[in-house]
């Protein structure tokens, strides 16, 4: 236990003047300034009342100093009550007493100063001993359920330097020194009262046995020093193998007053009693002086000069919190006694005390273990019973907050629109709740999708947007304009009463309107990115599917048809790329970077989304093949890395796949639709979805990384002899508006003015427009010859974006044959006529032919 340093607390109480002092008509020598300051022998005011005698033969100011100021911890005036003194002395000490600290309160002063009145009181006005006992038992009863208490009391007096037991009167008792208990009185009786009333009865009986004799100074003068001690032993009620026991002692001491034989006119026995009283008080003063002068030095303290000081050894300078009550008289008749009392009280303030809680750990015997276990089990059972009562009676009913996500499936009439509170963190949490509702909606409509072939084609597309908010939750909230242009059908599913009860749905509709305006502003400023467009379409598709009830397939078809203007609007900024594999409506044709490809393919591959219905085993088996990389040449090792990230590599044509019948027949486009339908029905070779211009696809080159925004950038002139690393697999997701046939090639190429850059060392065609896809077989045989290529790519391909207003889309399909990579390749000789025909077409379209 840590040691706490403290000082002796000193309070001063000024008693009211007695009738004898009032009759003497002497001026008071004590003036109370405030609660802590008093002035001894203040200056006499000028112009006193006539007839009053302020002087005399024993007038103090003639011998002592004037106007002395004393500061104490507390000063009580003549009007102070017993309760006031108790509240500022023993009441605060009881807190430390119950924490295991020893405490002591003693009254010091001259005879007739009011010490016994302060400590004992009278019938109608009890003193500190009575009030302390009542307050102590009140606090013990308040802690009865937590701890077990035992109270012992003893009452003794020091009369003529002899110790007597006031509760069981007998002969003088000897005093002993115990190494563990300290100073003990041999043969002193200890009593254990059962209640506060019984303790007060014991105290009253002891006071009757105390020696009191009247003197000229005091009619009820105490001729002995009374010491009333209370011992409290407390320990926790929770049993254990080791228990902490606290034993504290409180001493309430009523000292006898110092007296002068000249004033008391004592003779015989009274004179001897007065001499012994003064002797013990003188020893007490010497102890106070020694303790005050110590200040950390090890000096001798004369405790053995008197039995009183031996009994008060631990209360004055030991492990005890001590309060000294100095009682004084305001009359000048006791001028010297009052001065001495104030002087010693002021000296006692410098006494420093070291406090330590008396806590002892006791180990229980092994024979008590069974009893301790039973007590612990009984306590656990009682606590469980209380807990059940509290939980049964005090549990608040669960509140259904409108913003909290529902754990059950959503109703049929409720659209899957999340509740969107304000704040970015709340928006991110709401996107997760939207995903859970979409998954439950997908499970509920799985039976309808199996019955309809159109739903089977759209099945994979419905699963893809379910996981899209996980890839970029910060962009999962904006929505396409088509979603918010139709708020009335969504609200129509609710009745008037449900709309009044669930305002969160109205809030969701307002947020969707805000998303519409954001989408329009971003599109007008050309700030839309492919991720944002995909997420807008994802949220649009989710809300549209939630609105469609089971069995309303006609509404779903019409809903997809209404999405055509939006798809055209989203794809109007990109150039359509012809390809022979365009069996589905067009989708997004913007550039897709590697980061976008990894973000799209990673989660879908992990989720195991099945391929589309058009996938064949022959095509699906080509994906697990290991990629074949071309060894870079010495010059290419020094080229910058940026152009390589946007290049592609051609391996072999996919026209033999058409001849083998592994791909479906090309059908003319019936009209544009949303990208979700196109993405669902496009050829897929694995659960992983790859964008159109990723390095593993076969579509023509897309714009560079600097052209991801819709506004074309003016790039500086770069080397056109760029080496492109194209994929060997067919595209997993064509992203074109329409399919163009062979008969439309001259017309289509005549409108394109972007330079076309094939691989060196073959004829280089500079043109406007995208690079035709490879369609001739046998290109894989030239792989070893292309390794020795010395062309270095120092620039990027510049493919201009034509505005949507100037772009005319042919209706027929366009199928371009694959250009030979080298004129020396024997496998390409049979296609010479096709090469010449394409070259003429390119020349007719303002193309420039260069032969290396």
From Swiss-Prot:
Chain positions recorded as ATP binding sites: 109-116
Short motif (MAPRE1-binding): ranges: 653-656, 774-777, 800-803
Composition skew (Polar residues), residue ranges: 664-673
Biased composition (Pro residues): 577-588
Name under which the protein is recorded: Kinesin-like protein KIF18B
GO cellular component: astral microtubule; cytoplasm; cytosol; kinesin complex; microtubule end; microtubule plus-end; mitotic spindle astral microtubule; mitotic spindle midzone
Modified residues (Phosphothreonine): 417, 674
Region of interest: KIF2C-binding: 711-736
Domain (Kinesin motor): residue spans on this chain: 7-351
Keyword list, A-Z: ATP-binding, Cell cycle, Cell division, Coiled coil, Cytoplasm, Cytoskeleton, Microtubule, Mitosis, Motor protein, Nucleotide-binding, Nucleus, Phosphoprotein
Lineage of the species this protein comes from: Eukaryota, Metazoa, Chordata, Craniata, Vertebrata
Principal place of residence: nucleus
Listed GO MF terms: ATP binding; ATP hydrolysis activity; cytoskeletal motor activity; kinesin binding; microtubule binding; plus-end-directed microtubule motor activity
Modified sites of kind Phosphoserine: 404, 452, 480, 558, 633, 639, 662, 822
Top-level taxon in the UniProt lineage: Eukaryota
Bias (Acidic residues) ranges: 451-461
Motif placement: Nuclear localization signal: 624-632
Pfam families cross-referenced by the UniProt entry: Kinesin
Regions annotated as coiled coil: 366-393
BP GO terms, sorted: cell division; microtubule depolymerization; microtubule-based movement; mitotic cell cycle; mitotic sister chromatid segregation; regulation of cell division
Subunit-structure text: Interacts with MAPRE1; this interaction is required for efficient accumulation at microtubule plus ends. Interacts with KIF2C at microtubule tips; this interaction increases the affinity of both partners for microtubule plus ends and is required for robust microtubule depolymerization. KIF2C phosphorylation by AURKA or AURKB strongly reduces KIF18B-binding.
Similarity section: Belongs to the TRAFAC class myosin-kinesin ATPase superfamily. Kinesin family.
Compartments, as annotated in UniProt: Nucleus; Cytoplasm; Cytoplasm, Cytoskeleton
